[in-house]
Each structure stands twice: as C-alpha cells, then as structure tokens.
C-alpha cells in the first residue's frame, strides 16, 4: 500500500544520486517494515541503482541482491538493515540526530538547505513497527530533540501478524 508513496518520494522529493549511492548530501530512506522489501527494491530498480529485472525476480532467494529484508552493504541504495520491527525507526532517529550534529560540527555557518548535512531522513513504518517498544522510545527522543529532518510515513492498514491491529492496539 506504500508503493505509490515510495515512487513519489524517490522521483519527486528525495535528493539522491544512483551514480553515487554514498553521496553525503543524499536524503536517506529507511524501510522500517523490512518485510515489504520489494517496495524498496522496485524504487532502486526504477531509479537506476544497478538492480535488474532478474534481481527482482530473485526476491528472497539465497545469494540474490534482493533478500527478504533489506541489508546495508549488500544492495546499493539500502541505507540500513531492517528486520526486527521498529528497528528502522530507531535507526532513522539516530541518522537524523547524527546529521544535525555533523552540520553543527562541520558546516554551522552555511545557510539552511545548502549544506550537505541538511539531508532529510524518510521512514516507512507499519502498524507492527509502531507496536514495538523501541519505536516508542525512539519517537520520544525524536520529539524531545525536535528533529525537523525526520519524517515517518505510517502505513495505517490495521494489519498485524496476529490479526486486525485492534486486537492489541488502539493508538
């Protein structure tokens, strides 16, 4: 259900360069709901990060560039390994805090929006991510630190591994 939003982010909003996946000024995309890895892999394929159609067909196959959960260092364009629900949210909060700290240390006088450290962190999170305690703790510090360079997009589809989310969650 987040595929159209991912397409919009990668093609109209995010600053990134498939020719230089490690460019320091790039925006970061974290798929906290790593089980929906195909959402990310399709965007990397369409954006030109080096994935081929055969890589997408090999989804979740041993040795493929498209494992069941995104793995940092395995597939170009993947910013962090995600698997345990909620972990991606916490990683993204850390990335946002680090970007702000790096800007303060290395580029404090550059006007807003012109520093390579002004990148934005985008997170896709599922209901299952938000049911995990780590996401609550990470969100609390993000709010306390007023991280304006972090956006979490919540896929509020009321689905969890157990059943409808109303069984265990009313937020």
What do these predicted ranges mean?
Residues 30-32, 149-156:
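Short internal beta-strands
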């Amino acid at each position: 259900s987040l595929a159209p939003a991912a397409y919009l982010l990668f093609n109209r909003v995010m600053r990134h360069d498939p020719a230089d996946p490690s460019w320091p000024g790039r925006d970061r995309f974290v798929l906290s709901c790593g089980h929906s890895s195909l959402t990310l892999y399709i965007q990397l394929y369409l954006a030109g990060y080096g994935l081929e159609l055969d890589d997408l067909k090999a989804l979740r196959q041993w040795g493929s560039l498209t494992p069941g959960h995104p793995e940092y260092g395995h597939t170009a364009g993947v910013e962090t390994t995600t698997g345990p629900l909620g972990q991606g949210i916490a990683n993204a909060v850390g990335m946002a805090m680090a970007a702000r700290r790096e800007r303060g240390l290395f580029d404090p006088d550059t006007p807003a929006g012109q520093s390579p450290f002004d990148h934005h962190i985008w997170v896709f999170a599922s209901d299952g991510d938000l049911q995990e305690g780590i996401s609550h703790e990470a969100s609390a510090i993000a709010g306390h630190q007023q991280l304006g360079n972090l956006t979490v997009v919540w896929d509020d589809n009321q689905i969890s591994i157990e059943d409808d989310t109303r069984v265990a969650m009313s937020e």
